[in-house]
Amino acid sequence: MAHTLLNDTFLRALLREPTDYTPIWLMRQAGRYLPEYNATRARAGSFLGLAKNPDYATEVTLQPLDRFPLDAAILFSDILTIPDAMGLGLDFQAGEGPKFAHPVRTEADVAKLAVPDIDETLGYVTGAVREIRRALTDGQGRQRVPLIGFSGSPWTLACYMVEGGGSDDFRTVKSMAYSRPDLMHRILDVNAQAVAAYLNAQIEAGAQAVMIFDTWGGALADGAYQRFSLDYIRRVVAQLKREHDGERVPVITFTKGGGLWLEEIAATGVDAVGLDWTVNLGAARERVAGRVALQGNLDPTILFAPPAAVREQARAVLDSYGNHPGHVFNLGHGISQFTSPDHVAELVDEVHGYSRKLRSGAAG
């Protein structure tokens, strides 16, 4: 049966093609701010019970789409699936965030690292991708919106692997980077190979765009960022399948705190660059000069403001970018668990409505 994508606005925006309006999706759009997500998570018993069960992962992936007219679905998973598949023993303790039972800190630890067999260790992820694609598609082969796959970046994965969890200052991983760069590069090399294989497996399973989350790239100094993060993102991008089933598969990279390096990130071969809220979107568009699309960049805490302020700030982001192709509206980071779903509805409505006016010249 031929498959038809009913809403391809997101994919066309990533490829800098004209669209009738600005598409929107939200980082962490399936998450704790939704009561239905919390109900599903309670049934699953734990976060990992949710993420590692394709049925539950599919259910929560679709929840925000059933509530809001978003323009893309994103696979429900976690960025730490790869190091978990490497045998580091991922666990989530209530109120503590992710922890690894076996952090990577010594020469012997690094020597044991290997690229995991994706089918064998991460089949639950590719299974979820296939199941979500089916759930997005009706009996006539019509798919509602595209599905985004994702991974953490090699550096961001290394931060958690070496620290053994989250960190305020990343002193353990940074100390390794400066005192034993040979070990750091060995970790990053394995991670880059694993991330590329993982994203390609998601593409083969049906992901129609992929995103690399470099959450902690901005923790690095200039120079160190290029050596320990950007170079390895470039390696990943060079290995990715850019076409599947006759369709292009766009690639997005997001470095939180990476606005300083926008031009360099845009030169890695990606189709789009995600931006946090510290960057002026109009200036960023001029800096990349049409080489890539841009994704972002509303401060997620604006969603705590009254609806009129949410709408005003959404218009400000759209006005900053201007009436040009190549913009995907998003937050500058993941949505807070304390956000009101009603305010998200206001945001999505304003982005769609106001961007249509911009296209027609009726805004103002």
Swiss-Prot record:
Source superkingdom: Bacteria
Places the protein is found: Cytoplasm
Gene Ontology biological process terms, A to Z: protoporphyrinogen IX biosynthetic process from glutamate
Xref: Pfam families: URO-D (PF01208)
Primary location: cytoplasm
Enzyme Commission identifier(s): 4.1.1.37
Subunit text: Homodimer.
Alphabetized HAMAP family for the sequence: URO_D (MF_00218)
Organism per entry: Burkholderia vietnamiensis (strain G4 / LMG 22486) (Burkholderia cepacia (strain R1808))
Catalysed reactions, semicolon-separated: uroporphyrinogen III + 4 H(+) = coproporphyrinogen III + 4 CO2
GO-annotated cellular components: cytosol
EC class: lyase
Source taxonomy: Bacteria, Pseudomonadati, Pseudomonadota, Betaproteobacteria, Burkholderiales
Pathway in which the depicted protein is active: Porphyrin-containing compound metabolism; protoporphyrin-IX biosynthesis; coproporphyrinogen-III from 5-aminolevulinate: step 4/4
Site label Transition state stabilizer, positions: 78
Similarity comment: Belongs to the uroporphyrinogen decarboxylase family.
Function: Catalyzes the decarboxylation of four acetate groups of uroporphyrinogen-III to yield coproporphyrinogen-III.
Listed InterPro entries: UROD/MetE-like_sf, Uroporphyrinogen_deCO2ase_HemE, Uroporphyrinogen_deCOase
Protein name: Uroporphyrinogen decarboxylase
Keywords: Cytoplasm, Decarboxylase, Lyase, Porphyrin biosynthesis
Disulfide bonds: none
UniProt keyword Cytoplasm present: yes
